[in-house]
């Protein structure tokens, strides 16, 4: 059965798509299945309407018996149920639409958050399960790793510091191995490329080409050029382009991490592929203390170094005392004791730390050197003083002459020119050998300025700086050098960068530079409405980061008549509408209002300014909060319908006589149809009127008779709908006879009541059958059905094979091959003579052809021999003609006459 809304829309039966309404005496309008239906109507009548406008059922069988009425009532009940369900769904959809307009934060979001948190907890447990089994459930060492994993799950928690955009699950990323910060793959590739270009543009000119590293944008950890990321890998580096799996940590492969711990201990990480640093090694190893005195005990590999707290006892560097500190790692501390110690020269004694026994005083040695003339001028030192520095061979001041003199005499000058290179580095000293430094160079030379743009003649020792300012751009490529007489190696820019960072809140504090600025190092706390929950994000992300989901309960007072509002979490904006039952006492009936609280319902504002023309943009609809009155009471009260079909619960506000919208179903006077009116009141005028008997308010059947006709009769009953049997059909039928030539007119009742033989007689036209037999003669029978009988008695002529003898026989015997005519002796003699004549003609034709060919051959030979002389006689050949050649025409004509005479004689004799 179709749903009620589908039946209303399309209709069924003969009147589909046709709205019909039959006026009745009491003003009730009947609607067919194709017509419109009022809102709130129950069920659809699965019937059409007759041309007269009276409703009819879709099947005739359901009209004749009480079983049909029962089926109709069952259909109406099911349609009523479908219509009720449709109304319920419609109301639910309307309520959902109103709720979507009214609520800013629905409880479904909180349930979704709880589901997400539960799912996240399962993924975290699966990620850390292999680690927690090693640590007996202790997760204190996993806090830092948990923070990274939680940020990977939270939308907007992971931020690329280069583009200041959130990192999504389906984007290719790269993780720094130093600070474990996450960056977009295109961003970090561009960052590495720009960094290498900026460094290489400076170092290639000064130091030649070399492998330029590039730093991490956050921790400045340097990577080689070969370590520039080119492919997207998971956190552990095992899987390239890891697929997106909602049950795994984003950007992970789901396999065991197996990265080596830092510092390396020989073990590998047991967690599933994860972001952030690996936790400390949870393996158990047997190890001893630092001083090796205590017995080895099992400890975690990450905390395998331990102290037994006993005195160390190792001898210190002083060689006199032992270390008194508790068992410790590394070398022992210097000896803390103090003692009186001499300096290395032994002249002074002082109290000093025992850890530094060697020390120097500030006195000159003063010991007499081996020469006996001078004393040692070194400050307190260890060992012998050495030889006198003035002993042995010494050079003159210009280093050209060598002298062997006692240490008490000074080396004299040699008298030669000094010839030392002056401070200018170009000229040499022209004075004689002298003591002390050479004087400044005073020669005048053509000097170029430092930038190489100007020349000037001036003393060599004076520098020449022009006043031209350098216009080259500094390494920042923003500011000019502006230094006077710059040699080309412009100094780095000393101004502040001052560009606004990607966060749009701060400016770059670095020195002016090329390329992109480093990300803003500041962080900002994004808080919930109550401030109890916060999340720390990079500076600049606070404008696009959603506030964290606070699990605290909202503490705002209720705005409706209830004493307390429904519990819900902390949120921004106004609280969601109250959904508690109203529970106000209704004035009319005294029942409690069960509807949700409607003190602050959102109502679309009407009567606003209407645009005067198409040039004005229509304003958006505005909603205002207002208190609505309580809806009508919906407490169910049992009531019986007008037609006594059912007892249904009605809402309290609608208690009263009602129509159940079913079909009346009472049997009309025709005893064939039922009343198709909607449920209505029936008054009983006669005491014997039964419950199923139609009353004066029911319909009066105005349809034609729709009873089934006899087999073969296609004419409707000429009477209106009536009880009992229909009269016989007297319509004249036009039929073809068996031979399909003549049209006959017969009453319909004779055809429908006749048997096979009678029908054959009625269809016979009493004329000869016009059909041809297979032999070609016409059938001799009267108009008949079926195939014609094959009993042809017509006379046919039959001849012998030479066509000379002719006889007449019956057609059926000839077709049955019962009679045949053979040639006699006369026929054979005539055949023989005819064959002889043909042979003679063929022989004559052959001889004639031979003579013609002989004549052609002789003519050809004559042409080959050429012309003969005139006095020669031509050779003549006499050819004798045969008898046939001489008299052939005469013989042929005589033979023809003889054959004709003979044939005429034979034919005349046979007849």
From Swiss-Prot:
It is found in: Membrane. Residues 822-873 form a coiled coil. Keywords: Coiled coil, Membrane, Metal-binding, Phosphoprotein, Repeat, Transmembrane, Transmembrane helix, Zinc, Zinc-finger. A zinc finger (RING-type) spans 160-220. CDD domains: NF-X1-zinc-finger, RING-CH-C4HC3_NFXL1. It is a single-pass membrane protein. A zinc finger (NF-X1-type) spans 269-287, 322-341, 375-394, 428-447, 455-476, 480-499, 507-526, 674-702, 715-733, 777-796. Residues 67-76 have a biased composition (Polar residues). It comes from the Eukaryota. GO terms for biological process: regulation of DNA-templated transcription. The modification Phosphoserine is found at residues 50, 65, 106-109. Residues 1-76 are annotated as: Disordered. Belongs to the NFX1 family. This is NF-X1-type zinc finger protein NFXL1. The gene is NFXL1.
């Amino acid at each position: 059965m179709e749903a009620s809304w589908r039946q209303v829309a399309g209709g069924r039966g003969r009147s589909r798509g046709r709205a019909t309404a039959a006026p009745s005496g009491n003003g009730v309008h009947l609607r067919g299945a194709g017509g419109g239906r009022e809102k709130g109507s129950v069920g659809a009548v699965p019937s059409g309407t007759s041309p007269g406008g009276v409703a009819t059922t879709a099947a005739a069988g359901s009209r004749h018996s009480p079983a049909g009425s029962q089926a109709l009532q069952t259909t109406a009940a099911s349609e009523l149920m479908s219509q009720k369900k449709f109304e319920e769904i419609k109301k639910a959809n309307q309520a959902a639409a109103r709720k979507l307009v009214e609520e800013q934060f629905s409880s479904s979001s909180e349930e979704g958050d709880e589901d997400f948190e539960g799912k996240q907890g399962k993924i975290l447990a699966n990620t850390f399960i292999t680690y927690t089994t090693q640590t007996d459930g202790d997760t204190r060492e996993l806090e830092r790793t948990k923070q990274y994993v939680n940020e990977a799950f939270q939308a907007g928690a992971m931020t690329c510091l280069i583009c200041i955009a959130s990192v999504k699950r389906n984007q290719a990323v790269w993780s720094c191995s130093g600070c474990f910060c996450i960056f977009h793959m295109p961003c970090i590739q561009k960052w590495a490329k720009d960094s290498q270009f900026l460094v290489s543009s400076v170092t290639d000119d000064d130091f030649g080409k070399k492998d330029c590293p590039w730093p991490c944008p956050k921790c400045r950890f340097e990577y080689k050029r070969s370590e520039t990321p080119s492919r997207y890998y998971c956190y552990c580096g095992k899987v390239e382009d890891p697929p997106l799996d909602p049950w795994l940590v984003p950007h992970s492969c789901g396999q065991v991490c197996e990265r080596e711990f830092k510092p390396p201990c020989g073990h590998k990480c047991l967690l599933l592929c994860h972001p952030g640093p690996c936790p400390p090694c949870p393996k158990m190893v047997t190890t001893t203390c630092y001083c090796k005195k205590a017995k080895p005990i099992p400890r975690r590999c990450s905390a395998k170094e331990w102290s037994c707290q006993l005195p160390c006892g190792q001898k210190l560097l002083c060689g006199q005392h032992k270390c008194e500190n508790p068992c410790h790692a590394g070398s022992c501390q210097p000896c803390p004791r103090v003692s009186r110690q001499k300096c290395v020269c032994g002249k002074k004694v002082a109290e000093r730390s025992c850890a530094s026994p060697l020390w120097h005083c500030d006195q000159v040695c003063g010991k007499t050197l081996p020469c006996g003339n001078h004393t040692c001028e070194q400050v307190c030192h260890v060992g012998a003083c050495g030889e006198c520095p003035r002993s042995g061979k010494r050079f003159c001041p210009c280093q050209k002459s060598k002298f062997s003199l006692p240490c008490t005499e000074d080396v004299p000058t040699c008298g030669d020119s000094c010839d030392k290179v002056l401070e200018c580095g170009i000229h040499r000293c022209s004075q004689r050998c002298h003591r002390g430094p050479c004087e400044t160079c005073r020669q005048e030379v053509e000097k170029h300025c430092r930038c190489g743009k100007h020349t000037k003649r001036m003393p060599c020792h004076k520098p020449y700086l022009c006043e031209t300012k350098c216009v080259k751009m500094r390494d920042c490529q923003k500011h000019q050098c502006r230094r006077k007489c710059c040699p080309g190696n412009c100094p780095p820019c000393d101004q502040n960068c001052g560009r606004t960072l990607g966060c749009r809140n701060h400016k770059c504090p670095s020195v002016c530079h090329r390329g992109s600025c480093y990300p803003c190092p500041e962080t900002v706390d994004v808080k919930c409405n109550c401030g109890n929950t916060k999340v720390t994000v990079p500076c600049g992300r606070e404008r696009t980061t959603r506030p964290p989901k606070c699990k605290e309960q909202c503490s705002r007072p209720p705005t409706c008549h209830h004493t307390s509002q429904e519990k819900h979490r902390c949120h921004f904006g106004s609280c969601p509408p109250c959904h508690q039952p109203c529970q106000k006492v209704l004035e009319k009936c005294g029942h409690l209002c069960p509807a949700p609280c409607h003190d602050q319902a959102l109502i679309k504002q009407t009567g606003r300014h209407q645009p005067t023309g198409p040039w004005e943009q229509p304003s958006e609809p505005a909603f205002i909060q207002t208190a609505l009155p309580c809806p009508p009471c919906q407490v169910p009260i049992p009531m019986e319908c007008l037609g006594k079909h059912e007892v249904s619960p009605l809402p309290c506000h609608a208690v009263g006589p009602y129509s159940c919208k079913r079909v009346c179903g009472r049997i009309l006077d025709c005893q064939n149809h039922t009343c198709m009116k909607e449920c209505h009141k029936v008054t009983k005028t006669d005491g014997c009127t039964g419950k199923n008997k139609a009353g004066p308010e029911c319909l009066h059947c105005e349809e034609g008779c729709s009873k089934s006709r006899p087999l073969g009769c296609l004419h409707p009953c000429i009477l209106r709908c009536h009880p009992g049997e229909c009269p016989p059909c007297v319509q004249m039928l036009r039929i073809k006879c068996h031979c399909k030539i003549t049209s006959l007119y017969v009453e319909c009742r004779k055809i429908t009541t006749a048997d096979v033989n009678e029908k054959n007689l009625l269809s016979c036209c009493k004329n000869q059958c016009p059909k041809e037999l297979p032999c070609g003669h016409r059938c001799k029978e009267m108009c008949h059905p079926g195939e014609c009988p094959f009993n042809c008695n017509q006379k046919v002529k039959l001849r012998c094979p030479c066509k000379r003898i002719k006889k007449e026989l019956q057609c059926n015997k000839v077709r049955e091959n019962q009679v045949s005519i053979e040639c006699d002796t006369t026929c054979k003699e005539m055949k023989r003579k005819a064959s002889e004549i043909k042979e003679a003609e063929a022989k004559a034709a052959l001889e004639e052809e031979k003579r013609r060919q002989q004549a052609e051959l002789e003519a050809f030979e004559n042409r080959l021999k050429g012309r003969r002389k005139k006095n020669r006689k031509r050779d003549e050949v006499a050819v004798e003609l045969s008898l046939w050649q001489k008299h052939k025409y005469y013989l042929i004509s005589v033979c023809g006459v003889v054959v004709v005479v003979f044939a005429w004689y034979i034919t005349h004799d046979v007849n």
